[in-house]
Regions:
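Extreme N-terminus nucleophile/cap motif
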Residues: 1-52
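Conserved beta-strand-loop-short alpha-helix elements that form
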Residues: 2, 93-102
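Short, compositionally biased leader-like segments
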Residues: 38-69, 148-151
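Extended, highly charged
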Residues: 44-45, 141-161
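Short acidic (Asp/Glu) patches
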Residues: 50-58, 69-90, 107-117
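Acidic, low-complexity central loop/insert segments
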Residues: 99-107, 123
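Long, charge-dense
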Residues: 111-140
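Catalytic core of PPM/PP2C metal-dependent serine/threonine phosphatase domains
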Residues: 151-182
Length: 182
C-alpha cells in the first residue's frame, strides 16, 4: 500500500527543517520506490528512487514551499518511471494512498473514459495514475486544467467528482466495498 504526505511551509528555506520533523513518522521502507516532488523557481521538479536505492537523498527536497513525497512497494514487472508517485502532468503533481479492489480493472475502465491525450499519459499499471488523469479530465471539462490560480474550492469539487467516478467505475467492475483511498 502507498504512503503519501505533503508539506506546505511559508518559507522554502525552512522546508528541510520541516522534513526533519516529520521524518520519523514517515519511514521509507527498503523495498519501496520513493518519489519526491515540488516546485522550484516556478517549475515542477521531481525525483524518483528505486527499490534498494539509498533514500537519504529523498529527504533533500527541492527548495520549495510545497513538497510531496510518496512511497510504495513496486509490483512485479513494474518500472520505476511509470509506477512511482507523485505523478506529474504539466504543472500538476498528484499522489494517492490506500487500496482499491480490482485496481487494474478500475484503471482500465477509467482510462477508457478519458480524453485521448490524457489516456495516452497513463502509461503505468497503477489505478492511482488513472485517478490523476480522471482528476485532470474534470479540470479540463471546466476549462481550468492550465489555470495556475485554481482556487481550492474548485479543486476540491473536481476531486470529489473524480472520487465519485472512481466509486462508480469500481461498482461496474464488481467491487462491493467502498474504495479506501486518501
Amino acid at each position: 500500500m502507498s504512503q503519501v504526505f505533503a508539506l506546505i511551509t511559508s518559507d522554502s528555506a525552512l522546508v528541510r527543517c520541516e522534513l526533519d520533523r516529520v521524518r520519523s513518522q514517515f519511514p521509507l521502507e527498503g523495498g519501496s520506490v520513493v518519489g519526491v516532488g515540488g516546485w522550484q523557481d516556478g517549475q515542477v521538479v521531481q525525483q524518483r528512487y528505486g527499490q534498494g536505492a539509498p533514500t537519504e537523498e529523498a529527504w533533500e527536497a527541492p527548495d520549495s514551499e510545497v513538497v510531496m513525497m510518496a512511497s510504495r512497494p513496486l509490483g512485479v514487472g513494474e518500472g520505476i518511471e511509470d509506477s512511482s508517485q507523485p505523478f506529474r502532468f504539466r504543472q500538476w503533481l498528484f499522489a494517492a494512498a490506500g487500496s482499491l479492489d480490482r485496481g487494474t480493472e478500475v484503471r482500465d475502465r477509467l482510462r477508457e473514459e478519458l480524453p485521448e491525450f490524457l489516456a495516452a499519459a497513463v502509461r503505468g499499471p497503477t489505478w492511482e495514475e488513472a485517478a490523476f488523469a480522471r482528476y485532470l479530465a474534470e479540470l479540463r471539462n471546466i476549462g481550468r486544467i492550465e489555470d495556475p490560480q485554481l482556487d481550492s474550492a474548485t479543486a476540491a469539487a473536481c476531486l470529489a467528482s473524480c472520487a465519485k467516478a472512481i466509486e462508480q467505475v469500481s461498482g461496474l467492475t464488481g467491487v462491493t466495498t467502498r474504495p479506501g483511498f486518501t
